[in-house]
Amino acid sequence: MKILTKDTWQIIRQNWKNILLFELLYRGITTPVYMRLVSRGIRLALRAAGYSYLTPANIGNFLIQPVTLLAFAVAAFVGILILSLETAGLVTAFQGSAYYQKLTPLHILWGGLQKMKDEMEKRNWQLPLFLAAQYLLIHLPFILRTIVRYKPANFIFQELKKQPVAVTFLIILLIFGILAMIPRSLTVYGCMIEQKHFHSGVVRSWQMTHKRKWRIASLAMFWELAVILLASAVYVVSVCVAAVCVVYFSRQSLAM
């Protein structure tokens, strides 16, 4: 794992500042726009279904409404498109770093657009769906932590916890999904860099990950835990700083 981490750093250090800047700009622009789109879509679907808000009683009927299905389809399409473009941009950045090229965030974005165009010409429509599934598995802890804070998802998860059979089934399904995804983790490399079609990219990924599955899984798990710990630390520090600022300005106001 140490060698894999070192090799990865050797590749990205050529452009790590621009990769970080690209991620900050890309996520900073696309995330608020996408969240607003999803929020408006849900409000429109609620209005069309005749509801003011979601409850455990009306969520079933709400989900089968045609407008709801259309809103979810649009949100899924836009989300997959945003995710695919980001992935293509990062592949461009790593590919450029391997050839010792300095790439600006604009070059990374343009390279991502070019790779997206190539995938469309090859009709690799399975690749964006694969990327979405991979993204959901990797970010599942963050997604669940966000969803359970809102109604009626919190009620649904509370009821789900009371069903051990359902929980066991979901855990088995998750483990199966992760194990199935590991041998296919380098499919993007085969499609976007080696210019293969999706099925050939999957085969190429199997070849490259052969006898390295557990090493790749351990490396991915290590960095996932590192990101979670870093995000938690940043959150705690932010809360502490905010609390100190509130106390300070409150005392200043009282003193006046």
Question: What are the language-model segments listed below?
Answer:
Residues M1-M256:
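Hydrophobic alpha-helical membrane segments
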